[in-house]
């Protein structure tokens, strides 16, 4: 699975504070300790794994998106589409990344 260098650069060092579903099976929101949020459009209801940790890297292949966390964990999400499914906003709601 290839590294998503751009998204890795945006998220590296942020700690996962919580994960919740977007209503009506429209996606997942990963909240970080700095108040920023990663929103991922998913195909229907996605399982919500209970993982925490600091983002080390992000990998992506097709519709599979993996956040590699420290010390040793991976948050794997299935996106709705290979592109146009991921967005990151900072604590003020300013767009930092969109794909």
Annotate the PLM regions:
Residues 1-99:
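Surface-exposed, interaction-prone regions used to assemble/regulate multi-protein complexes
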